[in-house]
Amino acid sequence: MTEKLYLTSPMPPSVNHYTSVRTIIKNGKPLSMVYETKEAKDYKKAFKKIIEDEVKKQNWTREVNDTQHFYIDAVFYFDRIDKDCANYEKCLDDTITETQLIWIDDNVALFRPQRIYYDKYNPRIELTIYPVEYVGIFDSDVQKRMFETNCKTCKRYARNCSILKKAIEGRIQPEIHGCVCEKYSEIKN
């Protein structure tokens, strides 16, 4: 069974209200600086608390690493019908990332809006976060382990094979076709 984390986020600021720009004069020249809005800071503070509480309450014990990807299935409850769900992911993902409780960097987050409802009394986003089945270029952990088992009998493995490392990171390489490595060279006894 796949471990899942359920979160309910207040409505984050849209990308239009997440950051703003201020211009200052430095050494007689204008310099534009991007800063996080008060709305974004307030949202992040509130949502981080929710994440921390729910991780403990739901006993989310997954080890955080930089290669595990996660689905984030999102159900939106907007207060108005003129809103676009594509504008609300960034601040939400960044907030989850800042906790460092689920992932290290949101480059592993696969945000998937599932449905949109309208609730003017309680706007929110309900999230279901769970690890994907694939590992790098492999369709499953079983497929990765089979490939890795074969790698252990190759000369390159003892020298920290970069092909295996890149495959686990999800990098497409010309040396691998159909889960077979063209650079495989069996260790001679």
Can you name each region flagged by the protein language model?
Residues 1-189:
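Acidic, proline/glycine-enriched N-terminal capping motif
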